UniProtKB/Swiss-Prot annotation:
Protein purpose: Produces ATP from ADP in the presence of a proton gradient across the membrane. The alpha chain is a regulatory subunit.
Keyword Hydrolase: no
Family, per entry: Belongs to the ATPase alpha/beta chains family.
Residue numbers marked as site, Required for activity: S373
Subcellular location: Cell inner membrane
A GO cellular component annotation in the UniProt record: proton-transporting ATP synthase complex
Enzyme class: translocase
Binding site residues for ATP: G169, D170, R171, Q172, C173, G174, K175, T176
Protein name: ATP synthase subunit alpha
N-terminal signal peptide: none
Subunit structure: F-type ATPases have 2 components, CF(1) - the catalytic core - and CF(0) - the membrane proton channel. CF(1) has five subunits: alpha(3), beta(3), gamma(1), delta(1), epsilon(1). CF(0) has three main subunits: a(1), b(2) and c(9-12). The alpha and beta chains form an alternating ring which encloses part of the gamma chain. CF(1) is attached to CF(0) by a central stalk formed by the gamma and epsilon chains, while a peripheral stalk is formed by the delta and b chains.
Length: 513
């Protein structure tokens, strides 16, 4: 069949007129491979680092590797239905999670989707999970305390609002217990808590949530869970999602506390993603930017000035500074704190609480090693009464540890050395504390006062904790006004000190312990 040129031109003209051109300017590419949640895409020429990508079946991914002729992306969620040849579209957006007071009391995943079976989270706002930390100009120095209710921490390693304090130790030595006690102790203290569980067993996360509900702590807590059964991408993103939720409160002049339990598992997840993306491995097979992974997260915890809050809220909130306090947890292997991730996080944070398996097994719980645990900025935030009384405790313990090592070799000890050893044993006993029983400021002050002034020296070591408990009960019944004054002023005046001394002496004479 022969077509003349006029017929061809007519045919082309009719085809052009019948063409329906859609105004979809989004860039798109094709999947060339899918392995372990990592997708290689060809043809996405106009894509940003960290941009959300849309896959078939309402599935989204995150662009992480931008190479010359392909893009490496990680899938958020299930990826079994994605196959070679599928069309991928750019969205022009970066990953956001819901934020706001609607999340308080809920358990959500790394993307802010509820997983507690209590219906949808009706959050009105969303915010980007990757944000730049406030600059130096907008920050304030740490000056208000975060009371953990744990004697050894509040006395020797105090934490302030806006601080980053690392909790580090081997597995099964009480790291999560310390973090949970800190959350439980915030009841009535106007502090929103966020607990980010990374790479833990789902049953362990459930136990944490149950305990928080039993103690009434879920009323002011958000739980962000990326369990061991979730993908590496979810475990990598969970801390950033939790941090964004905490920043909502910080930027509006409120105080928040965030616990990352634990960042070792996040580093493992990031290492897995990086190796699958074929990024060059470095020390311990971690990628080169594993320091930046944690520094950009922990730098977002800060105390921000009143000017910052006023500017952020467009003048709605005035005269209020906000804070986000971070307690990252790091798990060590056989006590090795010189490994890559522990040394990185130690250098980023404002101090660390070392927990030791040997102390834990010896029955000293919380198993805090007072000698190497420090708080670089928390001293300025300590309450007056605790600051006044805690100096002696740290010295007693440090001298006791030193002398105890020598005492093993010496057979005859002089009187002063023996007294110091005896005092040290009693202080060590006094700092033991059962889980889920955080103390108020006045209770800590009374215990420290009794230890500093020698009221425990003539007791048997086994009687120390029963004496402490009995003394607290006695003060509650007969000296309620004294307790109220200490709790209100957070200080111990000369008159109150005299009243406390006589109360302790009369209780000791009664022998009711």
């Amino acid at each position: 069949m022969q077509l003349n040129p006029s017929e061809i031109s007519e045919l082309i003209k009719s085809r052009i007129q019948g063409l329906e051109a859609s105004a979809d300017v989004r860039n798109q590419g094709t999947v060339i491979s899918v392995t372990d949640g990592i997708v290689r895409i060809h043809g996405l020429s106009d894509v940003m680092q960290g941009e959300m990508l849309e896959f078939p079946g309402n599935t989204f991914g995150l662009a992480l590797n931008l190479e010359r002729d392909s893009v490496g992306a990680v899938i958020l969620g299930e990826y079994e239905h994605i196959s070679e040849g599928d069309i991928v579209k750019t969205t022009g957006r970066i990953l956001e999670v819901p934020v706001g007071p609607e999340l308080v009391g809920r358990v959500v995943d790394a993307l802010g989707n509820p997983i507690d079976g209590k219906g949808p989270v009706n959050a009105k706002l969303t915010d980007a999970i990757e944000k730049i930390a406030p600059g130096v100009i907008w920050r304030k120095s740490v000056s208000q305390p975060v009371q953990t209710g744990i004697k050894s921490i509040d006395a020797m390693v105090p934490i302030g609002r806006g601080q980053r304090e690392l909790i580090i130790g081997d597995r099964q030595c009480g790291k999560t217990a310390v973090a949970l006690d800190a959350i439980i102790n915030q009841k009535g203290k106007d502090l929103i808590c966020i607990y980010v569980a990374i790479g833990q067993k789902a049953s362990s996360i459930m136990n944490v949530v149950r305990k928080l509900e039993e103690t009434g702590a879920m009323e002011y807590t958000i739980v962000v869970a990326a369990s061991a059964s979730d993908s590496a991408a979810m475990q990598y993103l969970a801390p950033y999602a939790g941090c964004t939720m905490g920043e909502y409160f910080r930027d509006r002049g409120q105080d928040a506390l965030i616990i990352y339990d634990d960042l070792t598992k996040q580093a493992w997840a990031y290492r897995q993603i990086s190796l699958l993306l074929r990024r060059p491995p470095g020390r311990e097979a971690y990628p080169g930017d594993v320091f930046y992974l944690h520094s950009r997260l922990l730098e977002r915890a800060a105390r921000v000035s009143e000017e910052y809050v006023e500017k952020f809220t467009n003048g709605e909130v005035k005269g209020k500074s906000g804070s986000l306090t971070a307690l990252p947890v790091i798990e060590t292997q056989a006590g090795d704190v010189t490994a890559f991730v522990p040394t990185n996080v130690i250098s980023i944070t404002d101090g660390q609480i070392f927990l030791e398996t040997d102390l834990f097994n010896a029955g000293i719980r919380p198993a805090i090693n007072a000698g190497v645990s420090v708080s670089r900025v928390g001293g300025a935030a300590q309450t007056k009464v605790v600051k006044k009384l805690s100096g002696g405790i740290r010295t007693d313990l440090a001298q006791y540890r030193e002398l105890a090592a020598f005492a093993q070799f010496a057979s005859d000890l002089d009187e002063a050395t023996r007294k110091q050893l005896e005092r040290g044993r009693r202080v060590t006993e006094l700092l033991k504390q059962p889980q889920y029983q955080p103390l108020q400021v006045w209770e800590l002050a009374v215990s420290l006062y009794a230890a500093n002034n020698g009221y425990l020296d003539d007791l048997d070591v086994k009687q120390v904790l029963s004496f402490e408990k009995g003394l607290r009960e006695s003060l509650k019944t007969s000296n309620a006004d004294l307790i109220k004054r200490i709790e209100d002023t957070k200080d111990l005046s000369k008159d109150d000190e005299g009243a406390l001394r006589s109360a302790i002496e009369s209780f000791k004479k009664s022998g009711a312990y």
